[in-house]
């Protein structure tokens, strides 16, 4: 009964998401199914929910999502990102590398519609290379997401580290060779057949190059500050982001505009930038995870797998991929799958290899999902063919899965 309840809950979450319901409503409906199927008493329901809401993981992730999305919108609306893009375009003359770096930089900062922000910049470089619209869409979405497997401020990676026994750095170290190979494959695939002879303009003079580099670093300084505070000084993530917010509030003030007016508008950008939908979704996912852990379903799954000698590796590859692909949401794939698999995995480093592979396969499914918002928005911007784009991004998604499996096998059996 409990196992059937979880299967129904996951199916309900997927169907409701595809029907246009907000993710957090879909997950709350799934929680209700788990509660009914497990016959939790009112006292148990309140105890689990209260414990989940006051847990350090819940508090940390909620604060991270609130502060990071507000920070991203502030960077966008204050003009800092625009300065970054213009300076980078002046420094990097090869249109191919512009198409790689511009979406990657935009992707470092979390704000809704980021794919649309980088799309015009990618389009300008793409026209120089005579790329078709579909290829430009693939470049914009692929290079926007490619660094997330090693980016320490990526919410999906932070969620993995918070709800599993392994650290952020464990995942980054496992993913690093996969990232490097996937970058190479993606670059070759996107720019296959492209000739750049005669398209690369002359470089800037030393003084101009220095000025543009200073502008670039200045515009990115709040983000650089956050990363340094976290990686070097091990500062609590939400506090580090707040320091970055304070830095973003004071840089690139417009000349000739009253100070109070600029300060007021930037505070407004900050408040309006909070992505409450993502915040509520994180809260719902963590509550769902805790109800799963308190149910008997995990033991039922373990019993079924042991009785049928079903390979865990196959499930780790397909279940997260399918969940992310159908829902177009990496949070849901990670939040649903990680609690199910942790009890099934071997302890120590071998368990890490499974968890890292789970993360990569969920990213591959999310990357190629037909309801992934970045795909939808970019296709709409370029007026591109949906089937062609989905074919290309899912070819790259399949490559990511294969590279993840290869890394797993090498680490598991050879190292």
Which role does the model predict for each range below?
Residues 129-218, 352-354, 374-410:
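Membrane-core helix-loop-helix motifs of multi-pass transport proteins
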Residues 95-107, 131-149, 174, 180, ...:
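Alpha-helical transmembrane segments of multi-pass membrane proteins
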Residues 83, 114-126, 154-164, 331-344, ...:
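Re-entrant/interfacial helical elements at transmembrane boundaries that shape
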Residues 64-67, 89-121, 309-346, 358-363:
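Hydrophobic alpha-helical transmembrane segments of multi-pass integral membrane proteins
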Residues 1-4, 55-61, 87-100, 129-136, ...:
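Membrane-interfacial loop-to-helix junctions in multi-pass transporters
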Residues 1-70, 83-87, 225-307:
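Hydrophobic transmembrane alpha-helices of multi-pass solute/ion transporters
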Residues 60, 72-82, 107-118, 147-154, ...:
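Short helix-coil transition sites and intra-membrane helix breaks within transmembrane domains
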Residues 3-6, 37-41, 173-267, 381-384, ...:
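Long, contiguous bundles of hydrophobic transmembrane helices that form the permeation core
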